[in-house]
């Protein structure tokens, strides 16, 4: 299907199929659509409401055009990321979580970018932490397999996304592309901890991850708006496990955490956030550590390294207290040139 036909269907409130969306996104990724066509298509999808099958088709199209990180042993291979856009101004929680999870045996393919709506994106804080974000697919494969975590810089691996960057910026609204970054990991991950900016997305993203073949995944949305498992209130969770989906609430107090406020977990610029992460990895206690431990417990769970989130929380605490997590950070920051 060509993009003009898709726009006509959307204008008539007709639903596009997975294959139709995949075809149109492929056309866009190849630079074969005009700005007007791209804008019309994205707005049409948004107004009609993107379905799980349409999101799945778009993810497959991004992967069709991206660079792949070929990892044979996918056991314990995960990503920890969020859609962003929650406006919370927290520090880079999922980045700290990735390091803790890697220290506990997870293989983390951390897919991300620089800041869009926040002061500090994942790439920004990793640079401040001294962790190389520029490895290619061969180097990243080696690092993930041998050291447990590599950062897959989105523009390097999904460069064709640049074909919609201008239109997305000009539209100034959330589109299907706000969801695609966390879903289009270049590595064949089997587990994922993914935060979303809107609780209405939980079930749909759960269906997408199920259809992508993930063994374990948790899609999370704090009831305070956070795209993480929060410690200020409960969190709504959609869990994918063994081919099934279940939805539930998670209360931090029932897991042994003291409730905090959003101000307690606020961050700042990339340099400040890097300092926060290092302090946590060195054992500093408080709400910032608590939210990292809680989410790290979930990451270890989706990596299939523990049988429950409770066991994951216990293991994450031990990894920080034993300095294993900080040692993993030192190891990762020492990897500057890989041949």
Swiss-Prot record:
Q: Quaternary structure?
A: Homodimer.
**Where anthranilate 2 is bound, by residue?**
168
Any idea which UniProt keywords this protein has? Amino-acid biosynthesis, Aromatic amino acid biosynthesis, Glycosyltransferase, Magnesium, Metal-binding, Transferase, Tryptophan biosynthesis
Q: Which reaction does it catalyse?
A: N-(5-phospho-beta-D-ribosyl)anthranilate + diphosphate = 5-phospho-alpha-D-ribose 1-diphosphate + anthranilate
Instruction: Please give an example of a GO cellular component term from this record.
Output: cytosol
**Co-factor binding details:** Binds 2 magnesium ions per monomer.
Name under which the protein is recorded: Anthranilate phosphoribosyltransferase
HAMAP family given for it?
TrpD
Quote the record's binding site residues for 5-phospho-alpha-D-ribose 1-diphosphate: 82, 85-86, 90, 92-95, 110-118
UniProt GO MF annotations:
anthranilate phosphoribosyltransferase activity; magnesium ion binding
Name the source organism: Clostridium beijerinckii (strain ATCC 51743 / NCIMB 8052) (Clostridium acetobutylicum)
To which protein family does this belong?
Answer: Belongs to the anthranilate phosphoribosyltransferase family.
**Which residues hold Mg(2+) 1?**
94, 228
